[in-house]
Amino acid sequence: MKLCVSAFSLLLLVAAFCDSVLSAPIGSDPPTSCCFSYTSRKIHRNFVMDYYETSSLCSQPAVVFLTKKGRQICADPSEPWVNEYVNDLELN
């Protein structure tokens, strides 16, 4: 009897875990990073190594610049200098 109760408990635990994993639609990963504010200053172009755009699931769009020191800096994609840096990084 104890074995049946233990097995049933384990089955319920596994079912609860699988339900939460399978309940999300396929491909609906939560965004890995979102920006809630932008840098107030222009970054020196020499410090910027790469960039990425935040997910469309974020509350506001942003371009995240990756610096030589490994920092991630959020920038406003409507700023002219941000577009200039993105274009420059795409060409190189």
Swiss-Prot record:
**SMART domains in the record:** SCY
User: What are the leading ranks of the lineage?
Assistant: Eukaryota, Metazoa, Chordata, Craniata, Vertebrata
The answer to keyword Transmembrane helix applying to this record is no
Where is this protein localized, as stated in its record?
Secreted
Described by its record, this protein's role is as follows: Monokine with inflammatory and chemokinetic properties.
Q: Give the similarity note.
A: Belongs to the intercrine beta (chemokine CC) family.
Record-linked Gene3D superfamilies: 2.40.50.40
Question: What InterPro entries does the annotation carry?
Answer: Chemokine_b/g/d (IPR039809), Chemokine_CC_CS (IPR000827), Chemokine_IL8-like_dom (IPR001811), Interleukin_8-like_sf (IPR036048)
Q: Which organism is it from?
A: Rattus norvegicus (Rat)
What gene name does this entry carry?
A: Ccl4
Its recorded name reads C-C motif chemokine 4
**Stretch forming the signal peptide:** 1-23
UniProt-listed PROSITE patterns: SMALL_CYTOKINES_CC
Annotated GO molecular function terms are: CCR chemokine receptor binding; CCR1 chemokine receptor binding; CCR5 chemokine receptor binding; chemokine activity; identical protein binding
Which keywords does this chain's UniProt record carry? Chemotaxis, Cytokine, Disulfide bond, Inflammatory response, Secreted, Signal
Q: Which GO terms describe its biological process?
A: antimicrobial humoral immune response mediated by antimicrobial peptide; cellular response to xenobiotic stimulus; chemokine-mediated signaling pathway; eosinophil chemotaxis; inflammatory response; leukocyte chemotaxis; positive regulation of calcium ion transport; positive regulation of calcium-mediated signaling
Subunit record text = Homodimer.
Disulfide pairings: 34-58, 35-74
Gene Ontology CC: extracellular space
